[in-house]
C-alpha cells in the first residue's frame, strides 16, 4: 500500500467518466421565523439586551417618578398639633446616591453587549463572501477532484522529566523539584486507500437555485461510501493491515484518519449573495454597528437569519463504481484475517496453527452467487475450536481494530444469511446440497469460539496455494 502525507498522496487513477444518470437536485431552503430562532437563538445578545433595558427602565423610573415625603421640622409639629394631615413634598425615589447603582450596571452591561456584538461580527466575517457563479464552479471542481482516504499512525511514549520551580509560602521563596511526564513521538507512518482496482465516482447532488435568494449560507462536508462489497472489504483490509503493521512499536499508538480532495481548496462554509457588491441591507457592516449601538442587535440578527437561506452540500465519493480492468492485479486477497483479528495473541495462534478465522464480512457480503470463490479442497475440514484462543483479552490501552460496518441485526439477533469461508473447500457445496443455510452467530461467540477451516500440512491443492 503506498504511503504518503494526508495532503500528498501520490498518483491515483482518474475518476470514472461522466456516464452516470442525471444527478439529484438540491435547492437552498429558507427557514420560517420559528425555525430561524431555533437555529440561531443568540441568547447571550438577547439576555444582555433585556438586562440593559431593565436597568434603563429603573434609571428612568428614578428620574421621572415622584413619591411623597414627610416634611420634618417645626412645621410638621404644628400641623400634627392642629390635627391636620402631615405636610409632604414630592421627591425622587432614588435620592441620596441610589441613582448611581443602576447607572453602573447599565455601563457594565453595555460594554459586555458591545463585546458580544464584536464577536458575532467576527464570526460572520470568517465565512468568505462570493457569488453564485463562483460557487457553482467550485462545486464542479469538487465533483471532479479525486479523493484521498488517508491514515496516520503515531507511536509514542512518555518520558519522566524533572524541573526546578520556585514556590512562595508566607512571603518566603523556596525552590523545589517538580516531576512531570512529557510525550515523545518515536515513529510516524502514513498511508492511503488504494482503490485502483475498484474505481471511484462522484455521486454528489446538483445544487440549483442559488440565484433565487438574496443571501445563502452554504456549508460543505465530504464523505465516501462503497458501491460494492469487494470495495468495502478491500478498504477494511488495507486499513486494518496498516494499523496492525504499526501496532506494538511503542507504548502507545495514536491513530488518525480522514479524507481530502486533491487540488481543491476545500472550505467548510461560504456566504453566497446574488450580487456581492450590493448585499442586502441587513448584511452590511455599517447597518449592523448602527443598530447595535442602539441595543437592537438581536432583532437585526433575527431578521438576517429569517432572510438567509441555508443549504448543506455534501461531496460524496463512491468507491467500487466500476468493475476492475481485465489486466488489473488485486492489491491483496478479497478478505484478510486482519479484518477480524482483535489482539496480537490471536494473530500469533492463527499463524502457528495454520488456521483462518472466518470474517464477519464474509458472512454477509457473500451471496448464493459467489460460489466462484469456493474452490474444491478435499483436505479441508470444518471444526469448532477454542483451545487456540487466549482465555481473556489483554488489559491496558490498545488501538481498536477496524470492524466491518455491515449490519448483522439489532439487539444481538442474527439475520438469515450464508456463513461461508473464502478459504475454499466443499463446505459451501455441502451446505447447498444437504443442509439448510445457517445464520452467523453473534459477535462474541464468533470471536471466542470461531469456526475454523483447518488445512493439512501440504496445504490446499484445490486452489493451488500453500497453507496459510
From Swiss-Prot:
Residues 1-20, 384-438 are annotated as: Disordered. It is found in: Endoplasmic reticulum membrane; Cell projection, Axon; Cell projection, Dendrite. GO terms for cellular component: axon; dendrite; endoplasmic reticulum; endoplasmic reticulum membrane; membrane; T-tubule. Pfam families: TMEM151. Disruption phenotype: Knockout mice exhibited frequent spontaneous dyskinesia attacks. The chain crosses the membrane at residues 45-65, 98-118. Keywords: Cell projection, Endoplasmic reticulum, Membrane, Transmembrane, Transmembrane helix. It is a multi-pass membrane protein. Highly expressed in the central nervous system (CNS) including the cerebral cortex, hippocampus, spinal cord, brainstem, and thalamus. Expression is relatively low during postnatal stages but highly expressed at postnatal day 14 (P14), and declined in adulthood. Also expressed in the stomach, heart, liver, spleen, lung, kidney, and muscle. Belongs to the TMEM151 family. PANTHER family: TRANSMEMBRANE PROTEIN 151 HOMOLOG, TRANSMEMBRANE PROTEIN 151A. This is Transmembrane protein 151A.
Amino acid at each position: 500500500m503506498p504511503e504518503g502525507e494526508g495532503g500528498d498522496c501520490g498518483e491515483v487513477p482518474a475518476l470514472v467518466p461522466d456516464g452516470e444518470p442525471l444527478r439529484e437536485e438540491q435547492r437552498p431552503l429558507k427557514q420560517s421565523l420559528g425555525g430561524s430562532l431555533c437555529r440561531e437563538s443568540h441568547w447571550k445578545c438577547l439576555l444582555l439586551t433585556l438586562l440593559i433595558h431593565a436597568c434603563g427602565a429603573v434609571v428612568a423610573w428614578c428620574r421621572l417618578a415622584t413619591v411623597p415625603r414627610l416634611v420634618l421640622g417645626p412645621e410638621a409639629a404644628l400641623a400634627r398639633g392642629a390635627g391636620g394631615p402631615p405636610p409632604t413634598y414630592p421627591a425622587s425615589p432614588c435620592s441620596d446616591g441610589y441613582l448611581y447603582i443602576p447607572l453602573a450596571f447599565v455601563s457594565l452591561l453595555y460594554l459586555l453587549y458591545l463585546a458580544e456584538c464584536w464577536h458575532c461580527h467576527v464570526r460572520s466575517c470568517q465565512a468568505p463572501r462570493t457569488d453564485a457563479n463562483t460557487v457553482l464552479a467550485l462545486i464542479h471542481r469538487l465533483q471532479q477532484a479525486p479523493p484521498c482516504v488517508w491514515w496516520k499512525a503515531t507511536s509514542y511514549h512518555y518520558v519522566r522529566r524533572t524541573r526546578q520551580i520556585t514556590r512562595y509560602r508566607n512571603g518566603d521563596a523556596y525552590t523545589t523539584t517538580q516531576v512531570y511526564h512529557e510525550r515523545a513521538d518515536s515513529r510516524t507512518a502514513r498511508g492511503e486507500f488504494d482503490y485502483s482496482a475498484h474505481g471511484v465516482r462522484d455521486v454528489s447532488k446538483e445544487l440549483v437555485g442559488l440565484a433565487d435568494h438574496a443571501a445563502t449560507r452554504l456549508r460543505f462536508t465530504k464523505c465516501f461510501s462503497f458501491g460494492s462489497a469487494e470495495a468495502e472489504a478491500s478498504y477494511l483490509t488495507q486499513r486494518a493491515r496498516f494499523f496492525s503493521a504499526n501496532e506494538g512499536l511503542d507504548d502507545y499508538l495514536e491513530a488518525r484518519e480522514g479524507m481530502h480532495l486533491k487540488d481543491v481548496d476545500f472550505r467548510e462554509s461560504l456566504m453566497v449573495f446574488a450580487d456581492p457588491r450590493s448585499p442586502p441591507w441587513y448584511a452590511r457592516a455599517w447597518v449592523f454597528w448602527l443598530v447595535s449601538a442602539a441595543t437592537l442587535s438581536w432583532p437585526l440578527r433575527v431578521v438576517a437569519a429569517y432572510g438567509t437561506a441555508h443549504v448543506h452540500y455534501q461531496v460524496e465519493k463512491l468507491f467500487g463504481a466500476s468493475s476492475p480492468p481485465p489486466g488489473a492485479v488485486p492489491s491483496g486477497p478479497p478478505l484478510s484475517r486482519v479484518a477480524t483479528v482483535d489482539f496480537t495473541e490471536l494473530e500469533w495462534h492463527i499463524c502457528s496453527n495454520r488456521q483462518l478465522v472466518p470474517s464477519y464480512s464474509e458472512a454477509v457480503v457473500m451471496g448464493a452467487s459467489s460460489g466462484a470463490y469456493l474452490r474444491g479442497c478435499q483436505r479441508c475440514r470444518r471444526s469448532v475450536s477454542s483451545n487456540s484462543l487466549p482465555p481473556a483479552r489483554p488489559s491496558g490501552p490498545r488501538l481498536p481494530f477496524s470492524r466491518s460496518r455491515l449490519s448483522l441485526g439489532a439487539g444481538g439477533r442474527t439475520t438469515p444469511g450464508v456463513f461461508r469461508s473464502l478459504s475454499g473447500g466443499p463446505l459451501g457445496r455441502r451446505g447447498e446440497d444437504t443442509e439448510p443455510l445457517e445464520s452467523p452467530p453473534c459477535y462474541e461467540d464468533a470471536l471466542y469460539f470461531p469456526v475454523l477451516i483447518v488445512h493439512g500440512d501440504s496445504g490446499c491443492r484445490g486452489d493451488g496455494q500453500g497453507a496459510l
